[in-house]
Amino acid sequence: VRIYTIVVVIFTLAFSLLSGFILPRDVGPVMPLILIAALVVIGSVIATFSGILEGWMHEFMSREFRRAGYTMPPIYSRVVTLGFISTVMLSFSLLVLLYVTLFTPGAPTALVRLLLALSLITLIAGLLTLSIVALLSPKLISSFRATGALVELPFLLAILRVFSKTHLTLYDMFKLVESSQALRWWAEEVKHRESIARERGVSLLTAISFMAEDHPSLEVRDVIKRITLAGSYAGSPAGVVERVSTQYFELLRSRLERLTGYMYIALGIVITSLFLIPVLAVTIGPALRIPPSSIVLVSIATAAPVFLVTYTLIQSMYPTGFMLNPPGALKTFYTLSVLVILGLIVASLYLIYTGKPFNPLIAYSIVLASLAPAVALAQAYMARVSAYERFLRVIVDSTELAAVTGENLVSLMRRVAGGDRRVRKLIDDVERAVIDDRVRVRIVREAPNMLYASMMETLIYALRIGAPLQVFSEIATVYEHLKETLRRHQSTMRGVELTLAAVIAAVSLFSAVMIRVLSGIAAGIKTPTGAAAPGILQQFIIAQDPLMIYAVLTSMMVAGVVTGALVEKAKTGTIATSARVTLIYLVLSITGVLGLVAFQLLGR
């Protein structure tokens, strides 16, 4: 109640100060004081009944959260109650100002209407917003919870499968998950189940088994039900976890295979729709007398929906745990380079529309220079990702050698790594993380994706508990299987990347050849009387029309940038590392026509 009273006092003081600036000077002090006193009385009544209001809000929202399978945060009902009181007080304050204005001689009619509209809009919008928050927030939280649990479910199964080979019980395994930095959603879920266990006076495993009934995800319900039943009746869930994880890993593989199949179709549509525009511009555009600016506008209008639809398709099908998470510096430089490219496209469209000439060699040199830092950072980042791949192979080889020689696993890992500095640094970090939890947090945070974050954390946990060699062999087997699934997909997408590069180069060369051939044919045609060729033939002398050439170059650039971003998104799950592919496609797409322009400039 004290908090609500403070809110009422703050609104009253704010209204008193604002009324001194808003009200006309000829209004006496009596009327505002009376209305302020009325506002204080209204606020006091609201603050007095705020406890009852909060209790009703708590009961209503708790029921909605329970329906969504989640426990409402304790402060949630208080925040909603504060929002309700603030909305009502603000609306009443505006009504008080409206009342004073009505009794003020010569008050502007517009001010009266404005205060009335603001008061009604504030009250309606505030109550509507609070109602939506109270009704939809449990469903939104439930949706986020289901999505997060599904994203991390393969790696939860990997951890449970690895540690089911040890002496740890299912309770101990979930306690490890509770402290996990790689599986944040499941760590929060276990903490939440632990609070439920304390409230209901049951064990942690019993509280976790409740997920089989109230979790919003059907897949999570099925997995938890099978694991907890096996842990309760069989003592060890090893067999069930292995079967479930194998099924789920195969599901991931099939998802990536479907994505690869869809990408053949989607990228075929992308390259056909985007690169067909410049081809048509140089072949039938002159006959139809299409303005150069229209070519650029059509390219942009086609590229925007094609990019959004294809990007959404990839985002929905690509497993989130396999997506790379580049550092902020790489994202920043890539964003800046994209902004430079967009700026060049807009500038080109403006200059083409106004008919002003510009040098495309200088313009595209600026674009290539803007991509250079992003390319360098992307290459450095991908080299770091490759170090994690080599580290996984080192684990595989070291466990096989340790089974024969019986040597210490970490020492064998250093020997197998040899002179690979990046891998040796990862080994040193893992060894330090065994005794220093801050190093473990840093290793997980710096991992390129959830796959490697989970692998590193599982390896650290296994070293901490002194797990037998069989556990490390299981780590190598599980994560090598996951990595092989991802590697096959990325290998296929590299083939798609090279195929598209060849197609783009062919389209660029074809456009340049058609410009040269059609221009030469049109320029060489003479009428029998020696008069100038017809106007339609003059339109085909594209080589002498700089605006048409600039329009074709801009259209090719739009197609190259969009295709490069989508190919990289399908390969790694992010477009932030696409600077290299974008640069290659950009160079290939404009080389033919740009070479023709350079040849003509040198010829002059």
Task: Locate predicted features.
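Short, non-transmembrane cytosolic segments of multipass membrane proteins
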Residues: 33-52, 209-236, 440-468
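Bilayer-spanning, highly hydrophobic alpha-helical transmembrane segments
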Residues: 4-16, 81-100, 123-133, 252-314, ...
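Membrane-cytosol interface segments
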Residues: 1-70, 375-383, 596-604
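Cytoplasmic membrane-interface regions of multi-pass membrane proteins
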Residues: 49-73, 102-106, 137-141, 238-242, ...
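Membrane-anchoring hydrophobic segments
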Residues: 1, 157-272
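Juxtamembrane/interface alpha-helical elements of multi-pass membrane proteins
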Residues: 59-71, 112-212, 333-445, 454-457, ...
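Juxtamembrane "helix-exit" motif on the non-cytosolic side of transmembrane helices
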Residues: 17-26, 96-106, 283-288, 347-355, ...
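Hydrophobic alpha-helical transmembrane segments
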Residues: 4-5, 21-38, 107-125, 292-302, ...
